[in-house]
Amino acid sequence: MIQVENLSKSFGSKRAVDDVSFSVERGEILGFLGPNGAGKSTTMRMITGYLPPTAGVVKVGGHDVAEKPIEAKRLIGYLPESAPLYTDMTVEGFLGFCAEVRGLGGADKAKAIDRAIEMCFLKSVRHQSVDTLSKGYRHRTGFAQAIIHDPDILVMDEPTDGLDPNQKHEVRSLIRRMGQSKAIIFSTHILEEVEAACTRAIIIDQGKIVANGTPNELKDKSELANTYLVSINGTEAATVREKLGSVIESAKVTIVNDKPPAVLARVFPKDAGSDGALGQAIFSVAKQNEWNVNEIKKEQGRLDDVFRNITLSDTQTR
């Protein structure tokens, strides 16, 4: 549904987006991650036709955005960052205006307004003036205009920015529901949103794609993936390190906490395929030494760890 090929954008001598390529299919929810200034918003503006690229091609539903902008934009619902609204209109009036711009009229227009209001939980403010809405309701109204014409593709720039936890949960749930039948891309710097809503994620840094995969595939890149945390009462940290290190061949053992009452050790697998055997070996060592074990827990990788490792060098050079 969305094909981005060798996309670049320069502002003067600054290369904001540098040779970016990726695709998003129907049924996919792509999270576009990156630090501030990485090129997320610029890329999304080029996808929607709001900003022309310096080089490269964007195709939406098979239509080149530069050559057939009207055909491409018919398929897109766009929620820009800080979505502009006509504050002198009511919510219903604004959505009606957006529906007409999208070519809807009569019964189709009325159905589209009702549907968007219901999906975005706007019923209680339907007849309220936009300028009296809270930030959360304004954001929902912006979301509603993006889906008013039931587009096949949704492009959203920071869709939960500024919302409270309950509102964020509502928006993520809505994205997941719509993602079953649409191609969705949304930018964020909130890592928990990727795990909560996305089927795939891209990390962009200094205008370049530096990682691309499912949330689990990205977490597997973490140095903590498939490690084990072992919590033990009444045993010296040095003893724990020695026993685990000597019995579990070349697996690395680090002490996370050596203060009473519990020693906390992290045990790293020798290789990616040894984590199952590693868990069994840890249990055997604990049993043989009659340790008072609080917990043996296998750790999943952490997106924040992967994100930090990938983007840290750029942060240090800014």
Predicted regions and their residues:
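C-terminal coupling/interaction segments
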Residues: 270-318
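ABC transporter nucleotide-binding domain
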Residues: 172-270
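A short linear hydrophobic-aromatic micro-motif
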Residues: 121, 169, 249-255, 292-296
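Hydrophobic/anchoring residues in structured secondary elements
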Residues: 9, 127, 253-258, 298
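Short loop or secondary-structure boundary microenvironments that flank
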Residues: 62, 69, 234, 271, ...
